[in-house]
A protein has these predicted regions:
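Short, structured active-site "lid" loops
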Residues: 44-62, 66
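Single conserved hydrophobic/aromatic residue that forms the stacking wall/gate
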Residues: 106-115
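N-terminal beta1-alpha1 ligand-phosphate binding loop
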Residues: 1-17
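Compact, glycine-rich, soluble single-domain proteins
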Residues: 63-81
């Protein structure tokens, strides 16, 4: 099972990923967030990291505006190896060579929005 988590910046992409996983018959558990309302990404990085470490899920996908903050937070947990990937090559390489267990994705719904 795949653990999914995001902040408000990643919510829309997470919804698309859920549709894709449903179509492919891949099981997942959504750990939030559940809307576009502003939230703090560390909450969801922690939930997904714990789901993997506790054995509820095998792998995870985390999404925030840059993918960086949420992956840094997840990597604070011993046994978690989160990697920001921007294409299929880096995703496959980090899985094969670094044994990454969380894929961290970028999603900026408003590219001109200041951080």
């Amino acid at each position: 099972m795949i653990a999914l988590g995001c902040d408000h910046g990643g919510y829309e992409l997470k919804q698309e990923i859920k549709k894709y996983l449903d179509e492919k018959g891949i099981e997942y558990k959504d750990y939030g967030c559940d809307s576009l309302d502003s939230v703090d990404y560390p909450i969801y990085a922690k939930k997904v990291a714990h789901a993997i470490l506790d054995g509820e899920c095998e792998k995870g996908i985390l999404i925030c505006g840059t993918g960086i903050g949420i992956s840094i937070t997840a990597n604070k947990f011993k046994g978690i190896r989160a990697a920001v990937c921007t294409d299929c090559f880096t995703a496959e390489a980090t899985r094969l060579h670094n044994d990454a267990n969380i894929l961290s994705l970028i999603h900026i719904s408003e590219p001109t929005r200041p951080y």
